[in-house]
Design a protein with these regions (language model features):
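Signature of uroporphyrinogen-III synthase
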Residues: 1-228
């Protein structure tokens, strides 16, 4: 299948290789672009390099790409997935990867270690109160910095040549300009995105585990079940 994948411009590196592995091809469509907050980034990095944080949790490759080269004395660093981990590793940072592709896996992963620790969370200008509440409930101290925002591009998604459209976040779905059409298979990268799509009246036929590979595996199972 030919799959249109929602990505921030420049963030889709490696997608084609992964899709080819599963016998598909893909291209990027961008409903959002990134706008950085440089002052907030510098303040956060300086605090980390001064030892004021016990851990940094990167839930996206965007802050990892920007902050990684600036972290000269990083604390414990945890990435939400392998792509984010690889981005950090390029800067020579020793990084751990969560066993699941969701922020909610962070607190169980840290266990008792989190108690009394300052957990840095560089993220988009989109609230995640559930993560903050979970950290506080486990005795940790969340230090959240909204270091960039996602700005709608307003560009209609080019899906005329696609067999499937994969949304990679709830925000990308909510902000996308696109037109449903018969024959266009809708996909969600994970359950959070799927929930946003269902709420928006566009339920996905395929739901992944939060990763591109997991989604393509789910797609292949769907196609086999449909006899395609």
């Amino acid at each position: 299948m030919r799959i249109a994948i929602t990505r921030i411009p420049g963030k889709g590196a490696g997608d084609a290789r992964i899709c080819q592995k599963y016998g598909h091809e893909c291209y990027t469509v961008s409903p959002l672009r990134v706008e950085l907050y440089p002052d907030r980034i510098r303040e956060f990095v300086d605090a980390a390099n001064r030892g004021e944080l016990d851990c940094i949790f990167f839930a996206s490759a965007v802050p990892a790409r920007v902050m990684g080269p600036l972290l000269t004395s990083p604390p414990r660093v945890i990435a939400i997935g392998p792509q984010t981990a690889r981005t950090l590793a390029k800067s020579g940072i020793r990084v751990e990867t969560l066993p699941a592709f969701y922020s909610r896996a962070l607190v169980p992963y840290l266990g008792e270690w989190i108690r009394g620790r300052r957990i840095g969370i560089p993220r988009a200008d989109v609230p995640n109160p559930a993560l903050i509440t979970a950290i506080e409930g486990a005795g940790g101290i969340p230090v959240e910095v909204r270091c960039y925002r996602l700005v709608p591009t307003g560009t209609p998604l080019a899906t005329d040549g696609a067999d499937a459209l994969l949304f990679t976040s709830g925000t990308s779905f909510r902000e996308a300009a696109w037109t449903p059409r018969p024959g266009l298979l809708l996909m969600a990268i994970g359950e959070v995105t799927a929930a946003a799509m269902r709420e928006g009246g566009a339920p996905p036929a395929v739901v992944g585990d939060g990763s591109l590979e997991g989604t393509l595996g789910a797609l292949d199972r769907f196609l086999q079940g449909a006899g395609r």
